[in-house]
From Swiss-Prot:
Residues 6-149 form the Nudix hydrolase domain. A motif (Nudix box) lies at residues 38-59. InterPro entries: Nudix_hydrolase, NUDIX_hydrolase-like_dom_sf, NUDIX_hydrolase_CS, NUDIX_hydrolase_dom, RppH. This is RNA pyrophosphohydrolase. CDD domains: NUDIX_Ap4A_hydrolase_plant_like (cd03671). Residues 168-229 are annotated as: Disordered. The keyword Hydrolase applies. One of its GO terms (molecular function) is pyrophosphatase activity. It is an enzyme of class 3 (hydrolase).
Length: 229
């Protein structure tokens, strides 16, 4: 479904955790990282499409997230001809998107990349809100920057915990009880029976791990075949 200018209506999702870190998904069988997104079907509202895509790509249901904000207007990007299927060239120009800022209310194990039989991602991670966008395909970077900038003022504010104090208190408690400090295990954070697509990776405690800079992730390869981006 295209508008009169050749743009396909679409939604994009910026998903936050409780630390205001952002979900990044690695497109299946590639080294490309991106936010969840997808087209709006005929008869759908942007919000309905957003919740459908959220479940299809990330496995989350409406009660598991909070809608914080959305962009006021459509954000557009044009897709270069080499990325467009031949039968769509001449009338398909690109995407126009409404972006939503969401916050995860549940747990990391609620995320499920295999909620459908056609997964979009085979790995995921949390990262800081502001990171270089080098791993995003070039023609999408402008829209990512506009969406992140417009929605940044709606980021939830939260008190910074004094992790040093908490750590010190825990150490003294162990010392006073005569017990050695045990390494923290995160195995309980993985939901039993949770499945990922072949070759997927999962950070068992992404809420508490220190994310590596996004620019350290693999760079985006040039697709081998045109795609309807």
């Amino acid at each position: 479904m295209l508008d009169r200018d050749g743009f396909r209506p679409n939604v994009g999702i910026i998903l936050l955790n409780q630390r205001n870190q952002v979900f990044w998904g690695k497109r299946i069988r590639t080294h490309s990282w991106q936010f969840p997104q997808g087209g709006i079907d005929r008869g759908e509202t942007p919000e309905q499409a957003m919740f459908r895509e959220l479940h299809e790509e990330v496995g989350l249901l409406p009660p598991q997230v909070r809608v914080i904000a959305r962009t006021r207007d459509w954000l557009r990007y044009e897709v270069p001809d080499r990325f467009i299927r031949r039968d769509a060239r001449g009338h398909y120009k690109g995407q126009k998107q409404i972006w939503y800022l969401l916050q995860l209310l549940g747990h990391d194990w609620d995320l499920n990349l295999r909620a459908t039989n056609h997964p979009e991602f085979d790995a995921w991670r949390w990262n800081d809100y502001w990171v270089p966008l080098d791993v995003v395909v070039e023609f999408k970077r402008g829209v990512y920057e506009m969406a992140l900038t417009e929605l940044a003022r709606f980021l939830p504010r939260h008190e910074q915990r004094n992790r040093y104090l908490r750590s010190g208190m825990r150490t003294r408690e162990h010392e006073s009880s005569g017990q050695a400090s045990l390494p923290r295990t995160s195995s309980l954070l993985v939901k039993p029976g949770m499945e990922l697509p072949p070759g997927a990776s999962f950070d068992p405690d992404p809420q508490n791990s220190v994310p590596a800079p996004l620019e350290a992730l693999p760079t985006l390869p040039v697709p081998k075949k045109p795609l309807d981006a």
